[in-house]
Amino acid sequence: PREVWLTGALEGRFNTVNQYLSLVYQSDQAFEYLLDYFSQVEEPTLILLFGDHQPQVATNFYTDVLGTAPDTALAQKKQMVPFVLWANYDIPEAQGVELSLNYLSALLMDTANLPMTGYQKYLARLWEAAPVINTVGIRDAGGNWYGENEALPEELEAAVEDYRVLLYNHVCLLYTSPSPRD
């Protein structure tokens, strides 16, 4: 497989970045192959490719590239969920959609025009108030970021607290309910 690596002053200094770049290249080639195949298939097909966050690499890599230490805004940006939603039939097109991983299933079901669970419907509504909720913080509908220890506006705080309770309940039920085989 083809390898990709950093050049210039960064060459040979960040092997994890070189590995990441090579794997991104290989993944891109494989994704192209997959889409080429399914573009020829008659059965309606929807493909979702996503990453849950950008890779963790040495902080000094960012310092060397940016000329300054990474700040909270960069940390939040690294937690964004890059995704591609592709279909071999017409679906609504959108660019620049920013969301966190928790909303992806609701977006997928909505795009596929499939029935959503009550939980997914709730997430679709929450997405409007807080498009990004991750380990670094929360972004509101106005684009304002709040770090994990920052106070939230009252209405957003209530929405996020409701989400935490529902998430806890959802996870607990998932891991405490007997499986259909039991």
Map each language-model feature to its residues.
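Solvent-exposed soluble domains appended to multi-pass membrane proteins
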Residues: 1-177
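A short, hydrophobic C-terminal helix/tail in secreted or cell-surface proteins
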Residues: 178-182
